UniProtKB/Swiss-Prot annotation:
Protein family per UniProt: Belongs to the ATP25 family.
Disulphide bridges, residue numbers: none
Protein known as: ATPase synthesis protein 25, mitochondrial
Keywords, sorted A to Z: Membrane, Mitochondrion, Mitochondrion inner membrane, Transit peptide
Cellular component annotations (GO), alphabetically ordered: mitochondrial inner membrane
Role noted for this protein: Probable mitochondrial mRNA stabilization factor.
The keyword Protein biosynthesis belongs to this UniProt entry's keyword annotation: no
An annotated GO BP: mRNA stabilization
Species the sequence originates in: Candida dubliniensis (strain CD36 / ATCC MYA-646 / CBS 7987 / NCPF 3949 / NRRL Y-17841)
Alphabetized SUPFAM superfamilies for the sequence: Nucleotidyltransferase
């Protein structure tokens, strides 16, 4: 009865509402409603009579995915390039492929084949996400392994799993705290994966869309350079009216003032001298406001340059005071977005470079004493613990401070590589260095304990090579040959060993030490029972890595044969040079 009462009341209410409407509308609506009901009932009865597996699906149409555009291949490209392009697009679903033929670049381009021999073709591809890039890189590595039977060199690919070795290293670092370089600065782990395939000089870069836009690798591998500055728009606070406009105005003023200071600094570097140093300093101080990090950094750069030219205008204490003023500035302390740990690392490296540029004004002990006091003071402004030994450049500069020279033209890897580009240099080096053997031993042990403490870890190749050149220029030949032999044994590839042989001959010819040259050419040149240049040269099919390398060795050996023509070992080297 209750149910009937409810149904009756609902019917009465509907009847009352219908009676108040016009008759035409009621009859029309009732007719349409009746017709629709008849049609729906007919359709329902028809569908009910058809089995479910024979009914037509009433689903939305499937969207057709856009085909990936495959770029045109360069002329005379190898078949492997076509295989990788099809693999990246068809199998892995990567988009926005772009291919660069480095043989088409001009000779003075840093990525041309004249400047480097590792890369011939570069492929840039975009992935949908970090997981997509990781999966594509993983499959690409397996493909190269099974198809070409060798493992490619992949960088930037990291999984979430942690190995046992990594766990042990992290456990050792618990008490030290996180290193300053542990921050990813908002960059994902697999946003940029580089794969050196080792096949026909093909290098593949897999990037996310945001990372590809920020890195702009297209400009690196292309001949067209665009000098456009991009500034990020300031964030607008929705709670404060006109906050975004006001913030953008202040930011533009800081950039404008920084540009003015940069022009003064550039003008001094190009046209400044001993007499005009005071004028440039006064002009810079008049424009300096101290409202941004960039202004303080540019002031440090200018004062350092003036001090190296005219120490009477700017002394060492004034340079250090710039850094202390920056960290005690209330204006900078009130600004957000400043990573002070990064600034501390940056200023420490710049201060070490300044100590190196002082040459013989201070001894190695005095320079390291200044560095010790500087690090103790600047670490007071750090909220977190910073491990400077995790930075490779810190270790390299720390070793560089163990010796001084009148000129900063000491031989290193960069200078020797320039000699190869010039196809040889027969003039001996007149630069001598003063090496503090005790400090060198202490720094070496300090690096070993703080960074290379594991039994399985040794000094990296670049650091051992730097130490080796220091020992050779300091006349410590026993330690030079010990490190030289250790580096040669660690090189597994024949082409790397050939390059190391060439730069060794160039280094010894520049140092111009007769005993060292005789030791190399008699004991290691054609030794049948041990390591020798002739054996590695034969194993490399009597070829060098480049024509510049061949001509550099030919010219230097010819000069050695002419200078020491009375010695059999020099004449043998000259005969080999004639055959090149």
């Amino acid at each position: 009865m209750i149910v009937r009462g409810r149904c009756l009341s609902r019917s009465i209410s509907k009847l009352v509402s219908l009676s108040s409407r016009p008759v035409g509308i009621i009859s029309a609506k009732s007719f349409v409603t009746t017709t629709n009901l008849l049609q729906n009932s007919k359709n329902d009865s028809t569908e009910a009579s058809i089995p479910w597996y024979m009914r037509e699906e009433n689903s939305s149409p499937v969207e057709v995915l856009n085909d990936v555009e495959v770029p045109e291949l360069p002329d005379n490209s190898p078949q492997s390039l076509q295989e990788f392009v099809n693999l990246l697009t068809s199998e892995y679903g990567l988009t926005d492929l772009e291919i660069f033929d480095l043989s088409q670049l001009p000779e003075d381009h840093p990525k041309s084949l004249e400047e480097q021999n590792d890369e011939n073709y570069v492929i840039l591809a975009t992935g949908k996400s970090e997981k997509h890039i990781y999966k594509a890189a993983y499959e690409l590595r397996l493909y190269i392994k099974h198809t070409y039977e060798h493992l490619p060199i992949i960088e930037g690919m990291s999984s979430n799993s942690i190995s046992k070795v990594t766990r042990r290293r992290l456990a050792k670092r618990v008490r030290r705290g996180p290193p300053a370089t542990a921050s990813t600065f908002g960059i994902g782990a697999n946003t940029w994966v580089s794969c050196g395939t080792g096949i026909d000089g093909i290098v593949i870069h897999l990037l996310s869309r945001e990372r590809r836009k920020s890195l702009n690798l297209e400009q690196l591998y292309s001949d067209e350079h665009e000098n456009e500055e991009s500034y990020s728009s300031p964030d607008i606070d929705q709670d404060r009216l006109f906050f975004g406009d006001r913030r953008g105005f202040h930011t533009s003023c800081r950039k404008l003032n920084s540009n003015v200071l940069s022009k003064i600094y550039d003008s001094y570097v190009l046209n400044g001298n001993f007499d005009t140093s005071q004028k440039f300093k006064a002009q810079f101080d008049l424009s300096f406001k101290g409202s941004s990090i960039e202004e303080y950094n540019k002031k440090f750069d200018l004062y350092r340059a003036i001090n190296l030219v005219n120490a009477n205008v700017v002394n060492v204490n004034e340079i250090e005071q710039i850094i202390w003023d920056k960290y005690s500035s209330l204006d900078l302390a009130s600004q957000s977005g400043i990573d002070w740990n990064t600034e501390i690392i940056h200023d420490t490296i710049k201060y070490m470079e300044y100590l190196v540029d002082l040459k013989t004004r201070h001894s190695p002990k005095e320079k390291l004493h200044k560095l010790s006091n500087f690090i103790s003071n600047i670490m007071c402004f750090s909220g977190d613990s910073i491990d400077l030994f995790t930075i490779d450049k810190f270790g390299a500069l720390l070793w560089r401070l163990t010796w001084v020279s009148k000129d900063n033209n000491a031989l290193d890897s960069a200078n020797l590589n320039d000699i190869i580009k010039r196809r040889g240099d027969s003039e001996p080096s007149t630069n001598t260095i003063s090496f503090d053997n005790e400090l060198g031993r202490n720094v070496r042990e300090l690096l070993r304990q703080n960074k290379y403490s594991s039994n399985k870890e040794t000094f990296p190749l670049w650091l051992r090579e730097q130490m080796m050149y220091t020992f050779g220029q300091a006349g410590l030949w026993d330690r030079f040959w010990r490190d030289w032999h250790s580096i040669l044994q660690s090189l597994n590839k024949t082409n790397e060993r050939i390059y190391f042989w060439v730069i060794t001959v160039l280094f010894l010819s520049k140092v111009d030490n007769r005993d060292a040259l005789r030791h190399l050419l008699t004991k290691y040149w054609s030794n049948p029972s041990g390591v020798s240049f002739v054996a590695d040269y034969t194993k490399n099919n009597n070829q060098f890595n480049s024509d510049n390398e061949r001509m550099a060795l030919k010219n230097v050996l010819g000069h050695i044969g002419e200078k020491y023509n009375t010695s059999p070992w020099a004449r043998e080297a000259a005969q080999f040079a004639d055959s090149l």
